């Protein structure tokens, strides 16, 4: 199972946002929607052995207590179409569910809980995508779990949490998070490994 975790630094954690204003009013939710689509879509199919976690920090002036994690499972997801609005609608629907400490089913293939990066790191051995990391094209083996940031850099607090994790790079230039996910999946495909 391949896993991608994307931190949405300004992403709202409530369903009261407009699908017509995901870049602004939803805190760059459009970036996260593209990451969902990149994680799962093939031509005429979905990657069933992939999960994507969105860590929604709650908006501009967010209280850390309002951070939620959404888990999307390729094995069970339904009603996902290859456009941002479709992914945004699923996120909005999932956020209607009141998050608790453990994952709750919010929709087919989507779960929600009240937690952030620290708890996710306790559960899975993640690697960090960083332009100064080991190149995925030359790495002997690749991890199955990757952490990315949205359009912003990791915060100091996040850097402290991930400082000892292995770091990998998709190349010498900084790319959009969704493009990075596609390149990683392509590398797994080229190696004939899962995903």
UniProtKB/Swiss-Prot annotation:
Keyword tRNA processing assigned: yes
InterPro entries (UniProt xref): Alpha/beta_knot_MTases (IPR029028), TrmY (IPR007158), tRNA_m1G_MTases_N (IPR029026)
Keywords carried by this UniProt record: Cytoplasm, Methyltransferase, S-adenosyl-L-methionine, Transferase, tRNA processing
UniProt: S-adenosyl-L-methionine binding residues: 129
EC top class, as a word: transferase
Subcellular location per the Swiss-Prot or TrEMBL entry: Cytoplasm
GO cellular component terms, A-Z: cytoplasm
Domain of life: Archaea
EC number: 2.1.1.257
GO terms of molecular function: S-adenosylmethionine-dependent methyltransferase activity; tRNA methyltransferase activity
One family name in Pfam for this protein: Methyltrn_RNA_2
UniProt family annotation: Belongs to the methyltransferase superfamily. TrmY family.
HAMAP family (UniProt xref): tRNA_methyltr_TrmY
Subunit: Homodimer.
Protein name listed in UniProt: tRNA (pseudouridine(54)-N(1))-methyltransferase
Protein species of origin: Methanocorpusculum labreanum (strain ATCC 43576 / DSM 4855 / Z)
Gene: trmY
